[in-house]
């Protein structure tokens, strides 16, 4: 079944020049880019995207990080796109949970600045795509 997912290459990935590497891995996995845009994120979009974390102690630093510079937002399509991207992304904690060979396992150094975000369910993918790409 073909599905869509939202992927963000976060500001640390853009700053470190890893956009091409991430896109290469996405394409090698067989996923298709349906939309791609370099964006500077405003506070309202950041708050809406991370609303589920609003009451957590790290929310402020998360907002500060995600708005600290440009990021790349993309919509990917393909069979089981959500699970496929999450597999190549690796675990959220790049040191303890991300396998070598995954994006985070190979390039990320800490949990918050872990290079990429990928939707975790069809429901969150629909919500996130509508937020980042309202015309789709």
UniProtKB/Swiss-Prot annotation:
Organism of derivation: Mycobacteroides abscessus (strain ATCC 19977 / DSM 44196 / CCUG 20993 / CIP 104536 / JCM 13569 / NCTC 13031 / TMC 1543 / L948) (Mycobacterium abscessus)
InterPro entries: NDK-like_dom, NDK-like_dom_sf, Nucleoside_diP_kinase, Nucleoside_diP_kinase_AS
Subcellular location: Cytoplasm
Transmembrane segments: none
Protein family per UniProt: Belongs to the NDK family.
Protein name: Nucleoside diphosphate kinase
Cofactor(s) for this UniProt protein: Mg(2+)
Role: Major role in the synthesis of nucleoside triphosphates other than ATP. The ATP gamma phosphate is transferred to the NDP beta phosphate via a ping-pong mechanism, using a phosphorylated active-site intermediate.
Active-site feature positions: 117 (pros-phosphohistidine intermediate)
């Amino acid at each position: 079944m073909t599905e869509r997912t939202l992927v963000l290459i976060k500001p640390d990935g853009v700053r470190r020049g890893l956009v091409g590497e991430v896109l290469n891995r996405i394409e090698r996995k067989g996923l298709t880019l349906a939309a791609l845009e370099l964006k500077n994120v405003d506070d309202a979009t950041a708050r809406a995207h991370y609303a589920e974390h609003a009451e957590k102690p790290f929310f402020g630093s998360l907002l500060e990080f995600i708005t600290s510079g440009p990021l790349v937002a993309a919509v990917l399509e393909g069979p089981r796109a959500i699970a496929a991207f999450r597999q190549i992304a690796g675990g959220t904690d790049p040191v303890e949970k991300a396998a070598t060979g995954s994006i985070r396992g190979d390039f990320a150094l800490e949990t918050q600045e872990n290079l990429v975000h990928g939707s975790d369910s069809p429901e969150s993918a629909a919500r996130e795509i509508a937020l980042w790409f309202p015309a789709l």
